[in-house]
């Protein structure tokens, strides 16, 4: 049903499953069957439950406007204080959309064995729309840096054989599409990505900063070299439970390894966790400036 008509499935099946506020959509007839004249939408939407749904959507739009304005004000304030915004637009890659919102983790794992062609077709449907949506978002907020949150492709999630077939091709096309559009995709790879380094090395040199959650530093240096900017490196555990001295030693090791080749952003592996000790965060900054 999704492959036959993704728009209709999303509106009349998926969204009503996710929220009771859109349940009336499940009972509506397909828009094309209402007729070509838009005035016929009136009778189709005249039911009391549909009117309530439209009011809910209006409230959603107003809340979204307020949220986006608050975010824009925050960005302006931080920039005035001297803190640049690393990225604005962000999304998850095509396979993860299918896994997170359509099939579930168990579903896609079974699909790779039982319905591989249908799974690939579903993933394929999201490639070009994601590229175009990301480009439009980046232009709207005037920030060319886009973060791609990548999680289902980690080493512990699937074999290399399945990664090569189901995950990497669509992700690669999305990344290349953004690069070709003059944007800077930032790949935040969650989980252990050491076995995936040879794939990341295929990307255009110097175009895709990669923020690692977990990776073998020596292998990253050997395989990636100076191809892409290494982002992260300081573990959440160290920032949360270590000492300032340990943090500084870790940062110095990072700089010794990746600094000579250029392209290093020292950061927490998943950013700065809420549990991080303030003195450890300060030590990380001081180590970069001192060393």
Over which residues does each language-model region extend?
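Catalytic cores of TIM-barrel enzymes
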Residues: 1-291
